[in-house]
Amino acid sequence: MRQTKTGILLANLGTPDAPTPEAVKRYLKQFLSDRRVVDTPRLLWWPLLRGVILPLRSPRVAKLYQSIWMDGGSPLMVYSREQQQALAARLPDTPVALGMSYGLPSLESAVDELLASDVDHIVVLPLYPQYSCSTVGAVWDELGRILARKRRIPGISFIRDYADDGAYIDALAKSARESFAMHGEPDVLLLSYHGIPQRYADEGDDYPQRCRDTTRELVSALGLPPEKVMMTFQSRFGREPWLTPYTDETLKMLGEKGTGHIQVMCPGFAADCLETLEEIAEQNREIFLEAGGKKYAYIPALNATPEHIDMMLKLTAPYR
């Protein structure tokens, strides 16, 4: 009997392939066309997206990408490739592919790469620690569309999320302790998660609870008093209410109250990207300092640290 050959698919959101208005427009069009991301009726959404949002946002967002672009490409792509390569180095007999929900490399190209390696079984690890319909759900949907076009369908193991996994919490705690050792222990550790519309949560998305689960476990691992840790939500888009409290408004409030030293961690981001390196490390830093705060440090994402790769090994081990 032939032994089953397993491959691993690391999935993330995606990124423009260049910091130009044209590339950003292509990326945003694909991203904002996904009903999992924006579920506004199409007759209302298409004219707004194509006639207003893409023409206005693409040049502005391209400038933001230019401020963080790395020699090897966008930070998300650079760190995601490093994660893929580091995991593959630890698993020499297991093919590891990288696929993005939007942009390149696509999820379909990742599936094709693994099937070309003659795998019988694919372990799908969406690198979103906290489940949301708009992220993990989008990977699930696209995977279904891809496999619906295949004659040969492999076995699939799909890891829904890992918000309170011990190896994940340990990796976050180690990263926070290293930052405390470098900058001193902050007056407040602010945990900023990507927001979603409040309506999604009201309709059953358990993302807010999964964020609370991560926060609870991390606070316990660090041994910090609860009053020294705050949980907020960032990157809201559009006019409808999103999860609160908002990160930028909270930092402004803390600065105005005279909070001296803030450190910000974004536990929901597996790799640094525009939302962490520009929005949190730069924009929100300015908000806090201009409001009267004294010291601000951003704690980097786990990226390709050994502890993060250890976590990926642990999560995928039962299915390999």
From Swiss-Prot:
Keyword terms, alphabetized: Cytoplasm, Heme biosynthesis, Iron, Lyase, Metal-binding, Porphyrin biosynthesis
Domain of life: Bacteria
GO process annotations (BP): heme biosynthetic process
InterPro entries documented for this protein: Ferrochelatase, Ferrochelatase_AS, Ferrochelatase_C, Ferrochelatase_N
Cellular component aspect of the GO annotation: cytoplasm
Keyword Cell wall biogenesis/degradation among record annotations: no
Disulphide bonds in the chain: none
EC number: 4.98.1.1
Residues holding Fe cation: 194, 275
Pathway(s): Porphyrin-containing compound metabolism; protoheme biosynthesis; protoheme from protoporphyrin-IX: step 1/1
Subcellular localization(s) per the UniProt record: Cytoplasm
HAMAP family for the chain: Ferrochelatase
Protein name: Ferrochelatase
Organism: Salmonella newport (strain SL254)
Gene that this sequence comes from: hemH
